[in-house]
């Protein structure tokens, strides 16, 4: 059981972040934000995939001016990602549910003061998003692109916002490699109680991003660290959500959806187990009940796994068993097994 660190709770739109709230999953569109149609379409795809909070890039004035039209067409909380030009943050703050600023490139303290004032007036939070690749010069010169440098930047900017009377804050500390990222979050966690946004930046394409994020975010989640998260995958909207949800579930940080146990296959199996598992995954994505299910290709491990599973299939030659709580409920031909299995899953899910 994960002993999650209790943090201050803030709200991004209607989504609670921190405190006792579930760890939320975020993503980011890759369309030009000024292209309202494409951006809204991507946000709706993310919403359907299970995203909780969505972020959009705001590099130009035309992007900032498009935010209102986007916000009117979506129901997910909207975060504006601001670099370099604080004036874009002032415009965005009139519309969005959260502002993300990068203290390494947003400009002078006077500019940050104006952003804070705009967020205070609308009662929206600020994410202090520290990146190893864009640290302020003073921290870069002293620490280099290190975990220590990221933590020093975060602490400095947290204090600056606090001195302005602003504490509606969440924090991220991202590097492109796992070790620096994990070390930074671990170093900063004991020093404040603000919610943490987890992520490994520039993680890469699907395979590499999944590996990096699973190691980095999984390690932090097992430490009880993290209140919201994004898995960054180059050009893969829905997969960001799928991987993030899987990391949350398999780390034990979230208790929703099926935990599917399936054998790795070997010479003993006499059924198309790969296709069966794939079909089960597709047909049960809507299930939120925290059920443990087992799909095994032969009797060697099937009975033992079934004893610990809510629902199980044990394949044999042309036939197989469906079991519920370790008891056989059906002995069927192979082509009937998945249908009956899904029926049992849906039946049990309704009881939760």
From Swiss-Prot:
Cofactor: [4Fe-4S] cluster
One Pfam family of this chain: GcpE
UniProt GO BP: isopentenyl diphosphate biosynthetic process, methylerythritol 4-phosphate pathway; terpenoid biosynthetic process
Entry similarity comment: Belongs to the IspG family.
Catalysed reaction, written as an equation: (2E)-4-hydroxy-3-methylbut-2-enyl diphosphate + oxidized [flavodoxin] + H2O + 2 H(+) = 2-C-methyl-D-erythritol 2,4-cyclic diphosphate + reduced [flavodoxin]
Record-linked HAMAP family: IspG
Cofactor stoichiometry and binding remark: Binds 1 [4Fe-4S] cluster.
Protein name per its UniProtKB record: 4-hydroxy-3-methylbut-2-en-1-yl diphosphate synthase (flavodoxin)
Pathway the protein acts in: Isoprenoid biosynthesis; isopentenyl diphosphate biosynthesis via DXP pathway; isopentenyl diphosphate from 1-deoxy-D-xylulose 5-phosphate: step 5/6
Membrane-crossing segments per the record: none
Gene3D superfamilies according to UniProt: Dihydropteroate synthase-like (3.20.20.20), Sulfite Reductase Hemoprotein, domain 1 (3.30.413.10)
Organism: Sulfurimonas denitrificans (strain ATCC 33889 / DSM 1251)
Gene Ontology MF terms: 4 iron, 4 sulfur cluster binding; 4-hydroxy-3-methylbut-2-en-1-yl diphosphate synthase activity (ferredoxin); 4-hydroxy-3-methylbut-2-enyl-diphosphate synthase activity (flavodoxin); iron ion binding
């Amino acid at each position: 059981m994960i002993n999650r660190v209790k943090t201050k709770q803030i709200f991004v739109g209607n989504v609670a972040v921190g405190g006792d709230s579930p760890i939320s999953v975020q993503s980011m569109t890759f369309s030009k934000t000024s292209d309202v149609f494409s951006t809204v379409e991507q946000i709706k795809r993310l919403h359907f995939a299970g995203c909780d909070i969505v972020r959009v890039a705001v590099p130009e004035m035309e992007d900032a001016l498009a935010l209102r039209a986007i916000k009117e067409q979506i129901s997910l909380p909207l975060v504006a990602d601001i670099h370099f030009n604080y004036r874009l943050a002032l415009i965005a703050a009139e519309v969005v549910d959260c502002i993300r600023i990068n203290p390494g490139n947003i400009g002078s303290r006077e500019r940050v003061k104006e952003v804070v004032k705009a967020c205070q007036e609308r009662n929206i939070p600020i994410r202090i998003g520290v990146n190893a690749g864009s640290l302020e010069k003073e921290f870069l010169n002293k620490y280099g692109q290190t975990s220590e440098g990221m933590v020093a930047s975060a602490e400095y900017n947290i204090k600056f916002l606090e001195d302005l009377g602003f504490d509606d804050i969440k924090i991220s500390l991202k590097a492109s490699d796992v070790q620096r990222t994990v070390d930074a979050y671990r170093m900063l966690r004991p020093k404040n109680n603000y919610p943490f946004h987890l992520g490994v930046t520039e993680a890469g394409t699907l395979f590499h991003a999944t590996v990096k994020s699973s190691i980095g975010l999984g390690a932090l989640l097992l430490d009880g660290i993290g209140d919201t998260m994004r898995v960054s995958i180059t050009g893969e909207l829905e997969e960001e959500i799928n991987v993030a949800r899987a990391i949350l579930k398999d780390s034990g940080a979230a208790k929703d959806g099926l935990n599917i146990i399936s054998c790795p296959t070997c010479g003993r199996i006499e059924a198309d187990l790969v296709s069966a598992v794939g079909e089960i995954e597709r047909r049960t994505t809507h299930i939120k009940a925290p059920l443990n299910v087992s799909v095994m290709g032969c009797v060697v491990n099937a009975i033992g796994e079934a004893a610990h599973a809510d629902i199980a299939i044990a394949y044999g030659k042309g036939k197989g068993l469906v079991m519920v709580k370790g008891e056989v409920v059906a002995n069927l031909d192979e082509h009937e097994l998945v249908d009956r299995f899904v029926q049992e899953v849906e039946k049990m899910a309704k009881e939760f």
